[in-house]
């Protein structure tokens, strides 16, 4: 049997463009990552193993087949975020899953979804742990940290309109840790990762949609110390809290009814 016929269709991104609130987007992203991990990655690894065994059984040892056999040895045990390719460094799953977000313009997002690739030419991919539902973060602050993290590629406001959610592969390197200040004056820690350009290469996108960063932070009054506004920051739950370790949980919010 032709080894390439043993592979599953690639994962179809969950479209979260209709998400109309912070909580809806939070839940949608969590659901999308869970679907990939629970319902897709396990059968994908099973099919990868079958493909790898078929390749390793080939009697031919020409240079292309030798490269495929090297790849097969890797794909036997690690989920790969793209189909088998003649590459020496595939995008493999990390030892511990790392959820990251790549921010981009609407036009660029449509291109990513159409071509099923996050890399174009030798352009680097900048990803961050800052989630797109963080409506307490100002667009201007997001621009500042993105340009601080990777000044080699200027980020403009349209580049933060949309997002794609992905698992960071083994080719994403830890770039730096930064802190962003939300509209209430609180600091929020974040991490940036960078993947160097490797020409156009397919990559599984988990979810996509539009961001909810605050566009007019100047119009938001900061809370008085004696009567703070509800903290809308979505925190990481610790081991002693309910829910899975490391899963983002929304803080309790008491909304006031309009008169």
UniProtKB/Swiss-Prot annotation:
The keyword S-adenosyl-L-methionine does not apply. It is an enzyme of class 3 (hydrolase). Keywords: Hydrolase, Plasmid, Protein phosphatase. The keyword Mitochondrion does not apply. Its EC number is 3.1.3.48. It catalyses: O-phospho-L-tyrosyl-[protein] + H2O = L-tyrosyl-[protein] + phosphate. One of its GO terms (molecular function) is protein tyrosine phosphatase activity. Residues 219-259 are annotated as: Disordered. It comes from the Bacteria. Induces differentiation and growth of neoplastic roots (hairy roots). Seems to function as a tyrosine phosphatase. This is Protein-tyrosine phosphatase RolB. It comes from Rhizobium rhizogenes. The lineage of its organism: Bacteria, Pseudomonadati, Pseudomonadota, Alphaproteobacteria, Hyphomicrobiales.
């Amino acid at each position: 049997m032709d080894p390439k016929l043993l592979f599953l269709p690639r994962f179809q991104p969950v479209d979260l463009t209709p998400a109309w609130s912070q909580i809806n987007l939070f839940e949608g992203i969590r659901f999308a990552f869970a679907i990939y991990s629970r319902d897709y990655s396990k059968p994908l690894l099973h099919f990868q193993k079958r493909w790898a065994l078929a390749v390793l059984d080939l009697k031919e040892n020409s240079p292309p087949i030798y490269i495929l056999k090297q790849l097969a040895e890797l794909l036997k045990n690690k989920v790969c975020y793209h189909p088998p390719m003649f590459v020496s460094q595939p995008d493999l799953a990390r030892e511990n899953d790392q959820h990251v977000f790549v921010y981009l313009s609407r036009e660029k997002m449509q291109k990513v979804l159409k071509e099923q690739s996050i890399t174009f030419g030798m352009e680097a991919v900048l990803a961050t742990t800052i989630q797109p539902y963080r409506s307490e973060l100002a667009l201007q602050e997001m621009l500042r940290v993105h340009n601080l993290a990777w000044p080699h590629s200027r980020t403009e406001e349209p580049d933060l309109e949309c997002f794609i959610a992905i698992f960071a592969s083994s080719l994403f390197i830890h770039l730096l840790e930064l802190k962003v200040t939300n509209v209430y004056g609180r600091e929020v820690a974040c991490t940036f990762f960078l993947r160097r350009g490797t020409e156009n290469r397919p990559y599984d996108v988990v979810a996509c949609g539009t961001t909810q960063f605050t566009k007019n932070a100047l119009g938001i009054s900061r809370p008085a110390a004696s009567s703070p506004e509800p903290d809308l920051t979505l925190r990481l739950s610790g081991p002693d809290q309910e829910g899975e370790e490391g899963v983002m949980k929304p803080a309790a919010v008491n909304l006031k009814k309009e008169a």
